């Protein structure tokens, strides 16, 4: 039987296309198989993760974390309940280990190591209040040893932590006992680190520290530093400006207004010194108290016609009065 040329071409073409169609059908079936395999693999990964997570030992939690990381490498783009649970575990585990590591370094007084651990955490999470707080503590204590290498960073961390507190973004006070204690310490530390280079900002920080419901409200050192910062900062600046603008010139309304501002700053400084003396009640504080009292007497006399009359009464009653 003869097959026409046209029919032969049709049959031949059909024969050539059959493998293609067959492959196409096969390709359409494979995703279903792949999806099943993926689901099975995903369940296996999750089951392994749960097996380790159920056991509360440190080693099992570490293994669960490794399982979770592998799970997210394969299925991190998914958003089902299991994937969300794994992501939550990773976040909480990393938070715990970071806090443990940074606390260990800080507890050992290895302040440089504390910063090494904290820096990359803040790069990923700039508003991590816990880390900002620990680094401020570490940086402040490092400065007390005479090492100023961490001061610049500590100042920035303290400013950021204070901003978070002032903006109401801090819901958990850790590493501090309370938000007020955090506000007190952070401002005291900031003021202490700035008191030489920027006394105006330092005075503002010390004022916030003593106004907080924290131990710094009754800390004589905080009040003494507040008084010194007022004198070295705004009082000195305004006095220099006053002498330049109004020295040996007739009085004027502008001159009087500036003079009144300077006088008020002096009164604020005296008040801070007086509170420092009044709050120095323990035997261990007596040597420091006597030094501050000598400074206070000279300062008070300058503003009271070279007389210290009324100073003792002021010391006795100052704690019953509000800050000026």
Where are these regions (language model features)?
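Flexible helix-coil transition and linker loops at the boundaries of alpha-helical arrays
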Residues: 30-35, 72-92, 119-131, 145, ...
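Short coil/linker segments at helix-helix boundaries
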Residues: 51-62, 84-87, 96, 100, ...
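Terminal, low-structured helical/coil segments at or just beyond the last alpha-helical repeat
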Residues: 172, 247-249, 256, 260, ...
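N-terminal leader/linker segments that initiate helical-solenoid repeat arrays
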Residues: 21-108
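Structural register within alpha-helical repeat arrays
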Residues: 51, 71, 101, 135, ...
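Bacterial N-terminal signal peptides
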Residues: 10-20
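Tetratricopeptide repeat
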Residues: 65, 115, 155, 203-204, ...
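Generic helix N-cap/helix-start motif at coil->alpha-helix transitions
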Residues: 38-46, 59-64, 90-101, 113, ...
């Amino acid at each position: 039987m003869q097959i026409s040329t046209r029919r032969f071409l049709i049959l031949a073409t059909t024969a050539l296309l059959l493998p293609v169609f067959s492959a196409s059908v096969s390709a359409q079936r494979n995703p279903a198989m792949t999806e099943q395999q993926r689901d099975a693999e995903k369940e296996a990964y999750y089951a392994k993760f749960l097996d380790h997570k159920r056991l509360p030992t440190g080693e099992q939690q570490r293994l669960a974390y490794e399982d979770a990381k592998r799970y997210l490498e394969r299925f991190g783009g998914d958003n089902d309940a299991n994937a969300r649970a794994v992501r939550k575990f990773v976040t909480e585990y990393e938070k715990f280990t970071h806090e443990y590591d940074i606390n260990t370094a800080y507890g050992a007084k290895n302040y440089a190591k504390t910063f090494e651990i904290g820096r990359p955490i803040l790069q990923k999470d700039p508003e991590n209040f816990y880390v900002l707080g620990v680094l401020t503590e570490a940086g402040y204590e490092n400065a007390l040893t005479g090492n100023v290498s961490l001061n610049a960073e500590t100042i920035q961390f303290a400013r950021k932590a204070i901003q978070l507190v002032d903006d109401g973004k801090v819901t958990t006070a850790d590493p501090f006992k309370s938000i007020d204690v955090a506000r007190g310490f952070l401002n005291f530390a900031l003021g202490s680190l700035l008191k030489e280079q920027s006394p105006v900002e330092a005075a503002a920080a010390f004022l916030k520290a003593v106004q907080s419901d924290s131990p710094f409200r009754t800390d004589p050192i905080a009040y003494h530093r507040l008084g010194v910062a007022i004198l070295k900062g705004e009082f000195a600046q305004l006095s220099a400006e006053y002498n330049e603008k109004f020295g040996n010139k007739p009085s004027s309304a502008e001159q009087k207004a500036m003079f009144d501002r300077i006088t008020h700053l002096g009164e604020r400084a005296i008040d801070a010194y007086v509170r420092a003396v009044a709050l120095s009640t323990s035997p261990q504080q007596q040597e420091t108290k006597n030094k501050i009292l000598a400074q206070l007497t000279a300062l008070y006399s300058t503003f009271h016609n070279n007389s210290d009359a009324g100073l003792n009464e002021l010391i006795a009653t100052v704690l019953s009065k509000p800050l000026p």
